Amino acid sequence: MPIKKTKVHLISGFLGTGKTTALKSLMAQKDPNEKWVILVNEFGEIGIDGAVLSDEGIPVAEIAGGCLCCAAGPQMGSALAKLLRNEPDRIMIEASGLAHAASVIDELKAAPFADQLEIAAVFTVVDPRQFINPDYAQQALYKDQIGICDILVASKTDLCTPEQLAEFHDKAAKLFPPKAKVVEVQNAQLDIQWLDIPVIEKSRYRLKAL
């Protein structure tokens, strides 16, 4: 009988887009029968109180220095191994705004975790005003975060004009391969059903241009 793999979800995005709030919104909807663990940066956008999460029965591991892209390797491996001892159903990872999401995914797919983990839906939270700004769109880090995600989340939509949102959707529709889902949210509130949206592994790669 094949070993059941633990699902892993990555939430990436630039600083200030609402990644931590998005993670908290998912936690608030968690099935009480599911066991989650969380891997976060030492310094989140608005902070995740490890003590509070422990009270809720959700183990939390923090990467020292606050940057998963720098910690991919021994620190990240050690944190993952510790979390897996809890035999979780899901691992939720909030990446630093400076993290290359593809590097984090590569670490998850490498030994010794390849046989233990299933890379499930990957989220990237963006501010549509940045997404349509060429100064952001041409940054390698930004393209990496956009390219690796399955679900592109437009946050802070209440601060955008209708024209900006229309341009966001126009550009998002032209991404190749297309995203499994492109959504608008307010206050970074995600739908927990998106965690189990079907994803295609080969659709994740680093875009050359938006």
What positions do the PLM features span?
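C-terminal accessory "lid"/substrate-recognition subdomains
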Residues: 2, 151-154, 160-210
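Non-catalytic interfacial helical region
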Residues: 108, 130-138, 160-162, 167-169
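A broadly conserved amphipathic alpha-helix scaffold signal in soluble, globular proteins
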Residues: 102, 106-109, 150, 170-173
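Conserved beta-strand/loop subsegment of P-loop NTPase cores
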Residues: 37-38, 91-92, 117-126, 146-157, ...
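Flexible active-site lid/hinge loop adjacent to a nucleotide/diphosphate
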Residues: 136-148
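A short alpha->loop->secondary-structure connector
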Residues: 111-117, 142-143, 169-176
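Nucleotide-state-sensitive switch-loop elements of NTP-binding domains
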Residues: 2-12, 17, 21-135
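Tryptophan-centered motif/residue detector
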Residues: 36, 113, 142, 209-210
